């Protein structure tokens, strides 16, 4: 997920994305602990996506003040 794509989305959609990504991360961690996850790099990718979305949210909130 590119930061440019994230940065143009509205705040409500970004908050929904964070919730969805956190749920996906939970699922991936659970699959990893049970040995069902073959592509463990997805955990890192989802964590980075969460960080990108949270950064965009922070920037939007800072700009609105």
UniProtKB/Swiss-Prot annotation:
The terms describing its cellular component in GO are: cytosolic large ribosomal subunit
The UniProt entry's GO biological process terms, in alphabetical order, are:
translation
Q: Which CDD domains match?
A: Ribosomal_L29_HIP (cd00427)
InterPro entries, alphabetized? Ribosomal_protein_uL29, Ribosomal_uL29, Ribosomal_uL29_CS, Ribosomal_uL29_sf
The chain's disulfide connectivity reads none
GO MF annotation terms: structural constituent of ribosome
Q: Which Pfam families match?
A: Ribosomal_L29
- Report the superkingdom from the record: Bacteria
UniProt keywords (A-Z) are: Ribonucleoprotein, Ribosomal protein
NCBIfam families assigned: L29
- PANTHER family under this entry? 60S RIBOSOMAL PROTEIN L35/50S RIBOSOMAL PROTEIN L29, LARGE RIBOSOMAL SUBUNIT PROTEIN UL29C
Instruction: Give the protein family.
Output: Belongs to the universal ribosomal protein uL29 family.
Protein name (database record): Large ribosomal subunit protein uL29
Taxonomy, top ranks, is:
Bacteria, Bacillati, Mycoplasmatota, Mycoplasmoidales, Metamycoplasmataceae
């Amino acid at each position: 997920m590119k930061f440019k794509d994230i940065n143009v989305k509205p705040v409500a959609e970004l908050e929904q994305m964070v919730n969805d990504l956190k749920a996906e991360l939970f699922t991936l961690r659970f699959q990893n602990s049970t040995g069902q996850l073959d592509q463990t790099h997805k955990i890192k990718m989802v964590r980075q996506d969460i960080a990108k979305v949270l950064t965009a949210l922070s920037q939007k909130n800072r700009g609105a003040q």
